[in-house]
Design a protein with these regions (language model features):
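Conserved, structured core segments of small domains
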Residues: 1-103
Length: 103
């Protein structure tokens, strides 16, 4: 167990929450661009785990392969955040490199 704990790495956990604007029809194109950006961040290894959540309180969670400050800066540039469609929380966390969601 000590060996495994010593392999832990710092990541950032993001919780994405919708604002009332999320539910407006004219927000759909911006939400689409938000999703495209997330896929690009995932492909680049910056946001390796992305989990959309389908309820009214949380839109999604993800793990950033960065520290919390860098994750905040990345999310501040998100088109949905900039448009006031989403708000987010960032929490520093630790995990084990190579962990993944099961196929």
């Amino acid at each position: 167990m000590h060996h495994r704990i010593n392999q832990a790495k710092t990541y950032a956990l993001m919780v994405l929450k919708p604002t009332p604007k999320y539910f407006e029809a004219d927000s759909r194109p911006i939400v689409w661009e938000h999703g495209r950006r997330n896929m690009a961040l995932q492909a680049a290894g910056i946001m390796p785990i992305v989990c959309p959540v389908g309820d009214e309180q949380i839109s999604g969670i993800c793990i950033f392969n960065t520290d919390a400050d860098e994750a905040r800066a990345i999310m501040a540039e998100d088109p949905g955040v900039r448009a006031g469609i989403f708000i987010f929380e960032i929490h520093g966390c630790r995990g084990f490199p190579g962990d993944a969601l099961p196929a």
